[in-house]
Amino acid sequence: MWHGVFIRLAMRCCFLAMGLFGMSAQAAVQHSHAITLRGAPALAEGFRHFNSVNPDAPKGGRLRLDALGTFDSLNGFINKGVAAEGLNRLYDSLTAGSEDEFGTRYGLLAKRIIRDPNDASWVIYELRPEARFSDGHPLRAEDVVFTFETLLSEGAPAYKAYFADIASVTALSPLRVKFRFKHKTNRELPMTVGEIGILPKHYWATREFNRTSLEVPIGSGPYVISDIDPGRRISYARNPDYWARDLNVNRGRYNFDQISYQYYRDGSVAFEGFKANQYDVREENKAKTWATEYNFPAVTDGRVILQRQRHENPAPMQGFAFNTRRTPLNDLAVREALSLAFDFEWANRALFFGAYTRTTSFYANSDLAAQGVPSKAELALLKPWRKQLPAAAFGPAVTPAKSAGDGYDRANLLRAQALLKQAGWHYRDGALRDVAGTPMRLEMLLVQPEFERIVQPLRRNLARLGIDLSIRLLDVAQYIERLRQFDFDLTVTGVPASLSPGNELWSYWGSQSADTPGSGNLVGLKSPAVDALIARITQAKSRDTLVTSVHALDRVLRAQWLLIPQFHIPFFRIARWDFFGLPNDPPRYGLGLDSWWWKGSPNIAQER
């Protein structure tokens, strides 16, 4: 049915009205090398390579990276165990994205993408006949069908939330797969199905998918697993027979012959490992370390290079997350009161050397962050939910209170005390108690010991209010399992943000995901208003509509005080041993690590 030329010729043999109707319907269907949310792709068909790469980058050498904790599984698609780092390098997806462009994907496994921009109820991906898995087995439409059926039935909850709107996945032929969706208004879904790594049906036919395993899996991506030291180290080797090594989306990328991850107990031990040249590249997330500890000999003599690489990504919302499933954290007034006890201005000065900006929005550092009072268009989206939403959602965008920066802001703590009284909590006999006399005791769950110094000032201010906050530090496996089961009061989390948000919002904030173990909805939010706004975001036909809808969502989330916002920086802090070549122009929306290359070192034998 997709041979448009023959259809149009046939229609011309019919009477005029019938022919015009057929031509109009056919003209809406597009066959393209790329898929976009809105508008045209930046790179035309036949482009040579992505912009922020060196197409002539040499192949060879190695890249050593770090990871924290441990791992016990090579299956990152399920809600069990702790998956090893880097597994995404094993699997190709239908499309590939450029770190210079958002809202666009280009064909990788897919040679052609067929769709109707005015009807988002379906999309067809036509596969490249040369696509192969690493064992040489052809990759075909049945593998795509198997992947989505398996992830929806046995995969981690995030897949079920993300792809809940898939009605069917059908192999039309060995090289064509059709996705049908339950609604024709979700404009993002035809593109996002192209982002998932495709699994080999023939490999999993004799294996149990939903279990942890250290058996080396088969993939179709640029790397294969070459060595494993369970829980301590995993190494990947560039596949010399990689089927897509010469495709334009891969030119200048995946240049290292070897990529390995060395695991460390915590960030402090990992930093010592970097200083000892046990791995090559470190993204520094501690302001104090960046300001005071990069003064070791390899830095001063130029063997280690420090760089701040700006990006245009919205900042993730990092904060102390409340589990609103639990009393008293299900009370909005209590959550706002606890938020007033975090003195960011003091922490930024005393702990972070003034390096950070307070995060005030779930889309900070972007045009998606709500500002000031709601516009008429935003109010139109919010008004139907006035009775269900906090009044603050209809006023100026909620922002965390500022302090004098002395670590003990009396005005903020008095406001917190008033809110707690409003919620029925009163200070007596040395503790904050409810009407039954039960003291307020909370637990902060942590996995990184470095965060204890950030939590302690919050703990002291809460103690001044009569609240007992204990700190529980767990190993990675215990921590992940506690979060999967929502077994916590407070924890540190980071909610990713996108310049083109969509289906991922169902996992982060959707009501259905609130009670699904392992989902991204850590805070337990259940809100019909939020569900309606997410639906509108996924259906937005224009950028203006998307921005307005995200502004409204941002206002609602901020007014709920679901977490205590922390801080961000608009750049990457990178320390790297001087073994690498980098493209002249860094990407706008990422670090671009896959486009680096090995430039060599005379002492590589000793450095391994």
Predicted ranges, named:
Residues 168-170, 226-237, 262-326, 333-337, ...:
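Extracellular/periplasmic solute-recognition and catalytic clefts
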Residues 126, 161-205, 220-229, 374-385:
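Surface-exposed binding/hinge segments that line
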Residues 128, 211, 244-294, 336, ...:
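Ligand-site clamp/hinge motif
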Residues 27-118, 149, 216-218:
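N-terminal lobe/hinge region of extracytoplasmic solute-binding protein
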Residues 109-111, 116-118, 134, 139, ...:
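Aromatic-rich, solvent-exposed beta-strand/loop patch
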Residues 70, 88-103, 149, 193-253, ...:
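Gly/Pro-rich hinge or "lid" segments in bacterial periplasmic/extracellular proteins
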Residues 67-69, 82-85, 229-234, 238, ...:
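Detector for C-terminal structural segments
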Residues 53, 57-58, 78-86, 112-157, ...:
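Aromatic- and charge-enriched surface segment that lines or borders ligand/interaction sites
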